[in-house]
From Swiss-Prot:
The gene is nfo. Keywords: DNA damage, DNA repair, Endonuclease, Hydrolase, Metal-binding, Nuclease, Zinc. It comes from Shouchella clausii (strain KSM-K16). Its EC number is 3.1.21.2. It catalyses: Endonucleolytic cleavage to 5'-phosphooligonucleotide end-products. It is an enzyme of class 3 (hydrolase). This is Probable endonuclease 4.
Amino acid sequence: MSLLIGSHVSMSGKKMLLQSSEEAASYGATTFMIYTGAPQNTRRKAIEDLNIEAGKAHMAEHGLSNIVVHAPYIINIGNTQKPETFRLGVDFLRSEIERTEAIGAKQIVLHPGAHVGAGAEEGIKKIIEGLNEVLTEKRDVQIALETMAGKGSECGCTFEELAKIIDGVTHNERLSVCFDTCHTHDAGYDIVNDFDGVLDEFDRIIGAERIKVVHINDSKNERSARKDRHENIGHGHIGLKALDYIVHHDQFKDIPKILETPFIGKDKKDKRPPYKHEIALLRRELLEPIEK
């Protein structure tokens, strides 16, 4: 089976899902990840305007599968301070799951939430409350809780915190995990020198079978920086060797591996996606990281 690897791609204009599939195919990808609209607002097109059938036909023709949706950043079900933010998060997440199912994706990646000053324990309680509200309807979609870097008041930057959330949710068979390499590195896990040790720890605390998506990113920061700044493959503190090992790890062979690395180019007008090169690099078809 060919390596299940792709990147974040856009979905906009008239073509919508077809455009996403065309972009992914142009990178030589076998999978991809999308937002169903702008990640910073709630404006969304109707499901019938997402051009799903044409998108699916193009995907089938070009060997693209196991696509992933990312929930927008504006969802924060960990917010204990503003009931309206929590309510918006729950309602919007519910509608995003509906759209995810319509598109044919099985995983929607979610940043668990930020406690905005109330403390991790209170934030986690709120996240559990929100997920219990969202996961009442029967849908063929799992929410993939993302491993976070620990920036600001983020919850879910340790495996123990994610385990607490999962244990508190009634229908937790509908929860999975998105393992982000930059975030786990920035949170303090030594994925560079001891990835198997980190995976064993994850397995002991959560269960490795919960990992259903992997975000492949290098990091601009040293381990434990709690910063969350993605870097291009081979240009950061994780490095190509460690990321190559993770991408080709047996545990992840049937799991979509998604690049979210920064666009490259000397100035703002010249920015372009690095994904065609980075996918080939991680397929071991190229030897050198992309020139920035």
